[in-house]
């Protein structure tokens, strides 16, 4: 009887929702931009949330779970959603006019990503190493900036969430609508 209850709970779609919520806290998931812009919606953030829930519900092995979140955009079509791990947290911005302000915003965003990565995947805090070595922390300032260098050389970009086939169908339909609209406008 106990085994049946466990199986029923593990097979429930609520399993992924429940355990995914813990991971989404680690990933600092938000439907908003975070930081001072939290009221500004973060489009498509829900897609990452749903990916996490589905990963738990489909019992995705942990090594793949991690690999997809770190390098899903390099693993082929269908895996890029997982890289939302790096996109759903705070993104700091400047007013765009002051180069120093822009550099500070980029540095804060980078620091947040390094700290989140180290907490999630290394189970270590790295924030102190941004400024100095600490005698009790295994991550040195050199280690911190080595990790930061990887993220600094990575670009955040918007990528299509639809497959190439879906985009082609959309383009074809849009062309048909445009042709009908143009014909209708010419007739009047």
Q: Each predicted region: which residue ranges?
A:
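Short, structured secondary-structure elements
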Residues: 1-163
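Short Fe-S-cluster ligation motifs
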Residues: 156-176
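Short flanking/linker segments adjacent to small metal-binding domains or redox-active Cys/His motifs
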Residues: 177-181
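Conserved small/polar residues in nucleotide/adenosyl-binding loops
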Residues: 183-188
